[in-house]
Design a protein with these regions (language model features):
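Central mid-sequence intracellular linker of multi-pass
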Residues: 15-34, 39-121, 285, 290-291, ...
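Extracytoplasmic gate region of multi-pass secondary transporters
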Residues: 116-186, 236, 240-241, 271-272
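A late C-terminal transmembrane helix in Major Facilitator Superfamily
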Residues: 250-283, 289-293
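Hydrophobic core of transmembrane alpha-helices in multi-pass small-molecule transporters
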Residues: 219-242, 260-261
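Structural signature of the two symmetry-related core transmembrane helices
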Residues: 196-211
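Paired intracellular helix-loop junctions of major facilitator superfamily
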Residues: 17-20, 242-254, 280-281
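Intracellular juxtamembrane helix-capping segments at the cytosolic ends
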Residues: 7-10, 234-249
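Hydrophobic alpha-helical transmembrane and interfacial-helix anchor sites in secondary transporters
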Residues: 14, 187, 277-278
Length: 332
C-alpha cells in the first residue's frame, strides 16, 4: 500500500518542480535502530499484540493522522493552488499561480496533463531511459535494503559487538547518510548536475563495502559501514530528482515514478537475500553482490549520461528535438 502511495507522492512533487530551477527535495533518512531492540511499549497488550507490533501500529496511526491533516494543508497542483474550499486550503494568489504556471510551462509545456490514454501511457515504457533509471534505482535499493536488514547482524556476528551495542551503532551511519544527502542536494542545485553525485555514491559504495567486509580492523570495518550506508541512502534522492529532470509529460513521469518504485521493491527482495548467517563473519557473497550493484550503478549512469550528452549536442546543432519540445535539454 505504501509503495503505491510513494509513487503517487513522487508524481505530485515532481509536478511542482521546473527543470531550470533544479530544485531538489531534501530527503533525510535517519533510522533509529535502538527502537528495534527495546521499543518503549509493553511486552504485550491484549491477545496477540506483542510489544514489537506497536512499532507498526504507531507508524500506521501517525500515517493516517498526517494524511487526514494533509488533506487540508497539502497544496494542490500549481494551476489549482489559488482555489479554496472546505476541504482545501488556499495557498497562492492568482498572480502567483500565473507566475508559477508560466515558469513551468516555459520549461516543459506540461502544466495541464493530457487526457489519460492507456496506449500513450504504456508507450512511455518503450523509452529506454525509463528502464535505465529503474535499473539504477533497483541496484541502489539492493544495497539500501541489504544494509537496513542485516547491519545489526553484521555488527553483532561479524564485528563482535553485543546485541545492545549493535543496535545502538546502527543510528550513527544513518545520521551521516542524512548529512551526505543534504550536501549532495545542495551541490546538485548549485551546479545544475545530477549524474556526478549518482556516480560518486556508486564509488563510495565500492570503497565502503569491501572495507565493511574484508578489513581486519573493527574500526575500519565500521567506517566502511558509514560510507556504504551514506552511498546507498544518498543515492535515492539523487536518482529520483535526476529522472524527474529528464522525463517530460505528466503521464510519462507518473509511469517512470511507478516503474522506479516497483524496481526498487525488486531491489529490496534481492537485498533481503544476499546476506546469510552461514557467511559470517565477513559475509563475502553478500558484500560482493552489493559491490556488483554499486558497479552497475556507475556503468548504467555513464551510459545514460552519454546518451543525454549526445542528444543535447545533436539538438544544439539543430537536429532531433528532445522529448518533443523545442529547447528542452537533458540534465547531465
Amino acid at each position: 500500500m505504501m509503495s503505491s502511495a510513494f509513487s503517487g507522492i513522487l508524481g505530485y512533487l515532481f509536478s511542482l518542480l521546473s527543470g531550470k530551477g533544479y530544485q531538489a527535495a531534501y530527503w533525510l533518512g535517519v533510522h533509529h535502530g535502538p527502537t528495534k531492540k527495546a521499543p518503549l511499549t509493553p511486552v504485550s497488550f491484549g491477545p496477540g499484540l506483542a510489544g514489537w507490533r506497536y512499532i507498526f501500529i504507531l507508524q500506521g496511526v501517525l500515517t493516517i493522522a498526517i494524511g487526514l491533516v494533509g488533506w487540508y494543508f497539502i497544496v494542490d497542483f500549481p494551476e489549482l493552488a489559488a482555489k479554496s474550499s472546505t476541504l482545501q486550503k488556499k495557498f497562492l494568489d492568482q498572480d502567483e499561480v500565473d507566475f508559477i504556471v508560466a515558469r513551468i510551462e516555459e520549461d516543459r509545456h506540461d502544466v495541464v496533463a493530457e487526457e489519460f490514454n492507456l496506449a500513450k501511457y504504456c508507450k512511455g515504457a518503450l523509452d529506454l531511459k525509463v528502464w535505465g533509471f529503474a535499473l539504477i534505482f533497483m541496484m541502489t535499493t539492493t544495497v539500501t535494503y541489504a544494509i537496513a536488514y542485516f547491519l545489526p547482524i553484521i555488527l553483532k556476528d561479524g564485528m563482535g559487538f553485543s546485541p545492545a551495542a549493535a543496535n545502538c551503532l546502527i543510528a550513527p551511519p544513518y545520521v551521516f547518510a542524512g548529512m551526505v544527502m543534504m550536501v549532495m542536494a545542495w551541490l546538485g542545485d548549485k551546479y545544475r548536475v545530477r549524474s556526478p553525485w549518482v556516480i560518486c555514491n556508486g564509488v563510495l559504495a565500492l570503497i565502503g563495502l569491501p572495507m565493511m567486509g574484508f578489513c581486519s580492523s573493527v574500526g575500519a570495518r565500521y567506517f566502511g559501514v558509514f560510507l556504504a550506508t551514506a552511498a546507498a541512502n544518498a543515492n535515492v534522492p539523487c536518482i529520483l530528482t535526476w529522472q524527474a529532470n529528464n522525463i517530460r509529460g505528466q503521464w510519462k513521469r507518473a509511469l517512470c515514478s511507478a516503474t522506479l518504485v516497483g524496481m526498487g521493491g525488486v531491489g529490496g527482495v534481492i537485498g533481503g537475500t544476499v546476506f546469510r548467517t552461514e557467511d559470517a563473519p565477513h559475509y563475502k557473497p553478500g558484500i560482493i553482490a552489493c559491490m556488483i550493484a554499486g558497479a552497475m550503478i556507475i556503468l548504467v549512469t555513464c551510459l545514460l549520461n552519454l546518451k543525454f550528452w549526445l542528444a543535447n549536442k545533436r539538438a544544439n546543432a539543430g537536429g532531433k528535438i528532445i522529448e518533443g519540445l523545442e529547447g528542452f535539454r537533458y540534465t547531465l
